Each structure stands twice: as structure tokens, then as C-alpha cells.
Amino acid sequence: MKSFFYLPWWFFKARILGIKRPLQTVLFISDKCNLACRHCSVYRTTNPNIKSYHQIKEELEYSYRLGSRFVDLEGGEPTMWHDGDKDLNSLIRLSRKIGFYSATITTNAFMPFKDSEADSIWVSLDGLGQYHDDIRGKGVFERLVKNIEEAGHPRISVNMVINSRNYRSVEETIEFAQKNPHINAISLNFHNPYPGTEELFLDWDMRSEVIDLIIRKKKNGYPIMNSVSGLKLMKHPGSFK
């Protein structure tokens, strides 16, 4: 209920009064991960940074003071995080105690998360079957589907990062998200290459075709969270004047 009143007040202050405050915090709690994904550099880290409970508490309190009221806990793989007797659920409870209206986690779903106390859960899904496994590892897709089903969480959504190896799976992944009773929605983004991952870049012409496909699917009622205007802005910069 508090968020119902806070959102229009935040919008009024930002748009009318010109007071710029953050609304959401994305907090990376650890670089530790259990996969070696093609598009990610985290697994190459020999000494991953893992934030302490105290440090995370300070960062959450700081974000709250700035005006943020929604937090997304990410990694690495956040379900692996712990500090003594504190685990990921401890951070979710801490977020609520501080005053955040919602605490979300983003996971690769390789490990079970049926005991998660998060308000909502984002699962990284980079295509169906072999497409997902080609990027994240053999057998990972099967475990993802199993863990989503067994989680029994009412607010699970998936996010697909599109690249040159999985773009052919975009349409079937959108349809999978619609048909799966355990998934609420899907968000789609594109891989931004950095040194060592250039081969994953999807050329601008094909990217434009994929975006047009996503827009058609959205207009046909598929549960795609991206806005049409936002999708159009993902096209080649030269497409807009």
C-alpha cells in the first residue's frame, strides 16, 4: 500500500518539481558464481569479491536515504551468498526492516530457490534447451525449468540476453514464457560486448529484425515487459533522428 502512494509522489517530484531521486537500487552482493557463461567475466575472477553483511547493510541504508524504495539483489549468483549465519533471506529481511517496499533477486536458477523470501524473482533464461546450455553449460536449462517449477513462487519472471548465438531462439522463448504457468513475464535485452566477447554481438540489421519480432509478439498479447518505445530505442542509433 505504501508503494501505491509513493510512486505517484516520486513521479510528481521528478517530473514536475525536478527533484531527481533514485527509485530502485540494483545491488551486486558478490562476484561468486557457479556457472561459466560465455557472455560473463565474473567466472574468470580468481578471487571474487564477496560483500559482508555489514557492508551490504550500509549500502542499503545509503540507498534508502537517497530515496530508493525497491532493491534488486544480484551477483555473481546471489543464492550462493552467505556471511556467517546470514544468507540471502537475511538480506531480504534486512531490506524490509530498513523500509524497502520490495526486494527482488536475479538468479541463474541452477540451485533450488524454493525457500526464497523475495517479493519477486528474475531468472536468467538465454533461450530454450541447447541455446541456453550453449551459453551457460550442459544440463543447465533442465535444472532451471525444474527449479522454477519446484519453487512455487507467485512472482517469477525471466530475462533473456540476446546475442549472435541465441537470437534464433527468441520467438520460442517468448512463447515458452507465456505457456509456462510458473512464469509471469519475460524481459529481453541485447548483449553489449566487451573485450573477449565480441563474437556475441548481434549485427544491427539482424538486431532490428529481432526487435520487430518482439514488438509483434507484444502487440499480440505476449507477456513482454519491455515497452514498445523502449524496444525501438534498442535499434541502430542511425534509425532515429
Residue ranges: model-predicted function:
Residues 85-89, 98, 119-120, 124-241:
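Radical SAM enzyme [4Fe-4S]-AdoMet core and its adjacent flexible, acidic
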Residues 1-115:
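Conserved alpha-helical substructure of the radical SAM core
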